[in-house]
Each structure stands twice: as structure tokens, then as C-alpha cells.
């Protein structure tokens, strides 16, 4: 462990998808960065499904890559099955998705971090936070009693905050199988007066590839020419594999229904809300009782790995029940479970405690990213981690923090939704959440965000050169010349949506006027006449940074927004 005299600019707590992006981003910004994690060998672990991207999620990966992040390059290095989802629709909502070899992905992330100058990896548990007399962050205290002094820190604790694993009627503490929970840190956050809640997620059993009757199942092929996520990847080098498709049956549902009382969720042992768009098989059977079957995609977890991920049957039923219902599905009558599925319940911090820079309002110098903010998914976590890491480095250097606005990227949509509306269930990104999705395409992420990254200082020379070449090629195609296939696709999409984009630009300019009206951090909302008690309470709770953010709060009316604008224009009384 680091000595008491050693000082870092930024400490990142947690080595998952948010933590790796935060640590790498802070180090790229020139900050002397430490990544503190329970186990170095688990950095970059894909704890649930072996895939990166999807509808909305793929856009986030492309944006992470445009800002020189890790996820896109690691996904390309590990891709073994690729699909462009939504291809039958317009290019604005195409969703690149890569199934990954878990081992290759983890190795790629660890290699990218090892090659990053200015980044030190430390093993240990963060147990406490030391604050200055003014309430700002001063140091991270480890479970072993070590003190890591820092100017800023990023908490990326995933499902580890007071995490509890549920295997049917059996429970045990942990953030995931094989890793301990972070109980002391959760207690510390409560002690800081932060609003914490409880959420849950789950994962299915893992199956032995050798016990599956593959020939009895229809094949699910990927695309012959997988498209890389990263601008820095020439082509995907890995062999591409096929998946297979099974399905639940009426017999499957009968077994599940007969054992619902033994499920951790339906047995009343879990209080936290689960992800609406990734329900457990118990939820599917109960909520969609009229459906006799549900598809299950059998996804190999690696080229040399005998483990198979059965996508679609996340569960918290006891292991023997899981084995029984799985063996009622086509091709799985002799299936062997390598590990049972389980649910994990964990603490999260109400994201309305944060600014748009992902900084805690109550603790200067402390940032939060990932599932601790109420999101679900690797991609959502990585996007938050990158932004938080950039801002932690800026704070450590005494510079102003930065944000991404809704019309600039899905990262901006994600953060704005979190900090203005909060969450009551794990938040997942979809293209439908972005009102400017025609211009926020996966194909143009580099053109949208790499210039921002260059201004911030988080983009390295290799990406800068690749971006310059892409921008030049796009300009050539727009002028009628010949360019790369990638540049031609970007220009074609722009022309397809040209009329809509022109109209959208005027809407963005109008919204920018509200976003330019700042609300002082200590503004007294009680002086604003005409506000309902509900709206006033929500303003006090969220304390929006601008008039534009206030206008996006749930329940805000045009009349209330006008009253707030009028109050902001009045001169503020001088302090006595």
C-alpha cells in the first residue's frame, strides 16, 4: 500500500467498467492517478453478459472511443460475434453490438491500463473518506488503515456497496461471486448525509458447452464483416462464431410458477427495484403469463472457453430449480450448470446529489460514476466513468469542470436524465431517450466529440492523427470528391436527415438560451412567487445549475419556469 507521505492527484475506487475509464481518462489528462481495486486480476471483468454495445448502448461505446476511452478498443480486441442491430431502420438508430471473449476483453483492458503513463494500480478496499475542515475530499482511507492523499477521487463501486447475493433462499454478502461487499464505504456515504437507495440486478446460470445439443438448435449467425467500435482499429482479427437459439416451454413455466415462493424477489427477500428492460425469467413468466415461450440465446463466452451464457433467463431461484427448468428447454435436456444464476442487491446514491460534471454537490472533489448512480450496463458505466475521470483531473489541476450537453452526445443525455430526474429503477440507455438522435449517430461520434476531447486534453496523439484523417476525408466527400467508406457513410446519413437537422439546429439554439441562464448554488427558491409546493420542493432537492436544467425537471410547467426566470433577473440583495 502507498506510504502516508505519497500523494496522488486522483484516486479511482473500483476496477470495473466505470473505474477503468475514469482512471485511464484522468491519467490521459496528465493527473497522477491511482486505481484502487479489491483484486488486480479482476480489472475489466464482464460480470454479467459477454457483450458490448446494442441499441443506444453502442452509441455510448462510440462516444467513449471518440474521447480516447478504453471500451471500444477492448471490445474490438475481444469481438467474436458482431451484429448491427436495427439495420432495417434509419442509420440514426443503428446499434453496433459485439459479443466478446471474456478473457480477451479482460486482458485487453488490463493491457491498455498497463500501457497508460501516470497510472498506478493498488490492491485494497476503500473503507473511509477523509475530508478537510471545509468538507472537501482530502484522502481515501483503506481497510488496512492506509491513507492515500489526493486532490480528487471517483467512486465507481458497481454493485459492491452493501452488496448481498441471493441464491434462492440462501444469501451471502458480496458484490459478485468471489468478491467481498463494501460495507464500510456505504456507511460513510450515509454519514455524509447523502440520499441512498437500494436496487437489484441479476445474472443467469452458466452452462457447460459440452452438455448442450447444438445440432438440435437453430443457428444465430453474426455479420461476416464485423464493424469495429474504435477509430483506431483497422479490422477485427478474431475468428467469428455463431450462437444458437433455444426457448422456454410451458413445462419450463410450470416449474418456475411452482417455485416462485423460493425466488428471492417473489419470496420477499429483496426490496430493491430491478431493471425493467432486463427482467428475470420469473418476471417474464409472471408479467407475460399469456406467452407460452421466451427466446433464450446461447452465447459462448470465449473461443477457448467451455462456458455458455444463456441470455434471457436471469434468475434468483435455487440452483436445483434452475437446473430443472433449464433442462426443459430444447437442446438443454442434459445441460450441466457450471455456476447458478443469482440476484445481487446493492446501495446506490440518488444521482440528483450530483452536478452535470458528476461531482457530488456536498463533497467538493468527490465524483461518482456507474451503478452507484443508479444505472445498469457496462456502456452506461463506462461513459460516466470517462466524464468523471476527466473532471476529477481538472479539479486536481485547479481547472474548471466540463459537461456534455444533451444535443452533443448520448453521454449528455445519460447524465442529464440522471441528475435532473433521478431513478426509481436501474437506468438503461435507449435511442428513444435522445430527442436529437438524428444528429447523435454512432457513425459521427468522432466528429461530434473528439474536438471536445482535444480541448479538454484527454485525446492522445494517435487518435488525434486518425481523427484528422477522418475529418479530411469527410470534407472531401462533402465537396464531391472520393473518400473512405466510413466518410461516405457519414455524409450520406447527414444528407438523408438534412431537413430534419436544420430544424433541429434552431431548437438547439433556443434551448441554449435557457442553458446559459445560471442559477446560483445558494439561490433561495422560496422568493419565487407562483410555484407549487411540489415544484419548489423539487427545485430545492435537485438545485439545478441552469434554467434549462430546471425546465427539464419532472412536473415543471411553462408558467413556473417563467416565474423562476423573472426571479433570477431581479437583483439579489447584498449580504448583510
Curated annotation (Swiss-Prot):
Compartment(s) of residence: Cytoplasm
Keyword terms: Cytoplasm, FAD, Flavoprotein, NAD, tRNA processing
GO cellular component, one term: cytosol
Cofactor(s) the protein needs: FAD
Main location: cytoplasm
Gene Ontology terms, MF aspect: flavin adenine dinucleotide binding
Binding site for NAD(+): 274-288
Gene3D superfamilies in UniProt: FAD/NAD(P)-binding domain (3.50.50.60), GidA associated domain, C-terminal subdomain (1.10.150.570)
GO biological process: tRNA methylation; tRNA wobble uridine modification
Residues engaged in binding FAD: 14-19
HAMAP family from the UniProt entry: MnmG_GidA
Subunit structure: Homodimer. Heterotetramer of two MnmE and two MnmG subunits.
Function according to Swiss-Prot or TrEMBL: NAD-binding protein involved in the addition of a carboxymethylaminomethyl (cmnm) group at the wobble position (U34) of certain tRNAs, forming tRNA-cmnm(5)s(2)U34.
Family to which this protein belongs: Belongs to the MnmG family.
Protein name, as recorded: tRNA uridine 5-carboxymethylaminomethyl modification enzyme MnmG
Gene: mnmG
